[in-house]
């Protein structure tokens, strides 16, 4: 199993990053909240990974630290939550914000995430609350004061930012028309792709 990668960032195509380690390029799917924190292209990055094997694909999911990965692993144990939905959840909210929403039973905030209906939101609250008790680290301590719309720092520039941002939202589970609408509502001339994604996801909460 591949648990950690240390290598050079070759490409960024949200929510995927291509990282070269020992001459091999790995395509890694990352929550956007983790993606924002990546170094610039051609810089070294360390990513903690979770390897998923399916009948039709082998996928790597990446995170900035072990606690975020631990949360992802607990999420995909919840009935009805697969890796793609877990990725979307942790893109719409940071790991800390998600823990806070579950602890405060913020059903209204959870159902705004792509692919999360009321039943799934209720299931997340019931099942994840118990799972947090078995996890260690600052992420899973009391976080009741964490706002659900805290911004992330973004400074990477890409071409055709609006189209790429909409494509990234579709990859996270939004319908194409909905993704385009979300981007058009917050688009501005000086915004890069990652800024547009961040602002669109933040506005959806």
Curated annotation (Swiss-Prot):
One of its GO terms (molecular function) is four-way junction DNA binding. Pfam families: HHH_5, RuvA_C, RuvA_N. Residues 157-205 are annotated as: Domain III. InterPro entries: DNA_helicase_Holl-junc_RuvA_I (IPR013849), Hlx-hairpin-Hlx_DNA-bd_motif (IPR003583), NA-bd_OB-fold (IPR012340), RuvA (IPR000085), RuvA_2-like (IPR010994), RuvA_C (IPR011114), RuvA_C_sf (IPR036267). Its main location: cytoplasm. Keywords: Cytoplasm, DNA damage, DNA recombination, DNA repair, DNA-binding. Transmembrane segments: none annotated. Residues 144-156 are annotated as: Flexible linker. Signal peptide: none annotated. Has three domains with a flexible linker between the domains II and III and assumes an 'L' shape. Domain III is highly mobile and contacts RuvB. Belongs to the RuvA family. This is Holliday junction branch migration complex subunit RuvA. It comes from Pectobacterium atrosepticum (strain SCRI 1043 / ATCC BAA-672) (Erwinia carotovora subsp. atroseptica).
């Amino acid at each position: 199993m591949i648990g950690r990668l240390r290598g050079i960032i070759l490409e960024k195509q949200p929510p995927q990053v291509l990282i070269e380690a020992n001459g091999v390029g790995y395509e890694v799917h990352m929550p956007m909240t983790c993606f924002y924190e990546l170094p610039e292209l051609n810089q070294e990055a360390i990513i903690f990974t979770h390897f998923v094997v399916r009948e039709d694909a082998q996928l790597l999911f990446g995170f900035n630290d072990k606690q975020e990965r631990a949360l992802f692993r607990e999420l995909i144990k919840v009935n009805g939550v697969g890796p793609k939905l877990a990725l979307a959840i942790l893109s719409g909210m940071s790991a800390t914000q998600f823990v806070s929403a579950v602890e405060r039973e913020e059903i209204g905030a959870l159902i705004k995430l792509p692919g999360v209906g009321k039943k799934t939101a209720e299931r997340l609250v019931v099942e994840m609350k118990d799972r947090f008790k078995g996890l260690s680290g600052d992420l899973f301590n009391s976080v009741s004061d964490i706002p659900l719309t805290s911004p992330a720092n973004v400074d990477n520039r890409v071409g055709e930012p609006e189209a790429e941002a909409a494509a990234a939202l579709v990859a996270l589970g939004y319908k194409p028309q909905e993704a385009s609408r979300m981007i058009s509502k917050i688009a501005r001339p000086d915004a890069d792709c990652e800024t547009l994604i961040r602002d669109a996801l933040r506005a959806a909460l």
